[in-house]
Amino acid sequence: MEKCSHESGRHSAENDGKYDITGSTATNVVDGFTMVAVGDVIVSRALANGHHPGFSEIVELLRAADVTFGNMETLIFDIRSFNGTPQAEYGGAYHVSLPEIGPDLKAMGFNIMGRANNHSLDWGVEGMRETSRILDESGIIHAGVGESRAQASAARLLETARGRVALLSCATSFTPMSRACDPAGEAPARPGVNALRLERSVVVEPDMLESLRKIRDALPNPGPKHDDREMLVLAGTTYRTGKDVGYTYAANTRDLADILRNVRRGKQYSDFCIFTNHAHEPGNWSEEPADFEQALARKLIDAGADAYVGHGPHRLRGIEIYKRRPIFYSLGNFFYDDLRTPVGADMYDVYDKDPQVDTDAEVTAAEETMGYPTAAGFIGALAEPVYYESVVAVSRFEENQLAELRLYPIELGYSKRLANRGVPSLAPRPQAISILERLQRLSEPFGTRITIEDRVGLIRL
């Protein structure tokens, strides 16, 4: 029975005895409904029959929930019969997984997965479509990509014994060529991801801006028709004056309006709504989310979402509870194995390797330790313990609101050899306490209090 929406003042049709003539967005799950949420799923081969000490305990957590979510950050296909190609624009590495991953993930307990991220089209539309086919055959609901923006942005529905779950998936971090669009006139739709475009500005002090203005004015190109004393554009980057030097982001208003409408639409057809966003901003180095993300997450919950699950930076970020709904700003990595093959010719070139001499594993090792190339050099190396530590988040709902959130610290075998690392197990006590204390510190600015009981983090409401 619907009890009460988390939207202020809105009650369900059953609660007030009136016929629902507007399409209620009230939450309507049976008491005890549980959601497991994890971060990035980057895994290349099936694990069910392998030797992975401690992983069975993780599987028990995944299987115990009504809905188990992860970010599907890889493509699934058999390279021997694959008709696509590695794309010139890719998400930093060419992620690829064997077809048996689909049924293996299902057997672990995953029943719903986000697809919108910066790797969604590493292997072109063909890789996107083949991954969709295999997930469909495996019985895993997925959202965030499609043959048009309308398809990519739509909610996908999962039936559970305690209520119907809607999933919507978007990415603020994506390759430009991967953004889906709808048809217009005679121009057909473009397949791809549900993208939320951001406009990034660099915030600088007033004297810094004046120095940049001198550089701009000295360059041999036409200046602006109207000069703004508090903002300028130099070499394609927007600079603005402000108190704190850093980055600021503004969401594209059309994209945001479309996303909010689709959340409302998805919730009208479901009992519980998960929204997930892939956001590397402001960078993998940052423990804090970018300045746009809190406002975005809250707007999505106001529109009907019951949980906001962030991922992208491969590391933990803080947790906020808003209107008795969880906001996970990043759940880090869940799987992070380094066994992807083939890696593609571009990766060999970037890391100065020779495919006739070096191996895919050696390219991957270089990528993890060096990061990815930029005009300023290599940045974003992930060969640090923090990227191999995370949590499994188990949310329990009573009376259609979050009642308890349990956080199980995991470690992904940072010190293991390349062929064996990246598979989660429950962290040993000292490491578990360290992970949870970090999460306490990261969540405190959002007013979230996490207690630690027997190496498990608890948020009780």
UniProtKB/Swiss-Prot annotation:
UniProt biased composition (Basic and acidic residues): 1-19
Keywords: Plasmid
Annotated organism of origin: Sinorhizobium fredii (strain NBRC 101917 / NGR234)
InterPro entries for the chain: Capsule_synth_CapA, CW_Biosynth-Accessory, Metallo-depent_PP-like
Pfam families: PGA_cap (PF09587)
CDD domains for the chain: MPP_CapA
Superkingdom assignment: Bacteria
Function comment: Could be involved in the biosynthesis of a cell wall component.
Region (Disordered): 1-21
SUPFAM superfamilies: Metallo-dependent phosphatases
Family according to the record: Belongs to the CapA family.
UniProt protein name: Uncharacterized protein y4uA
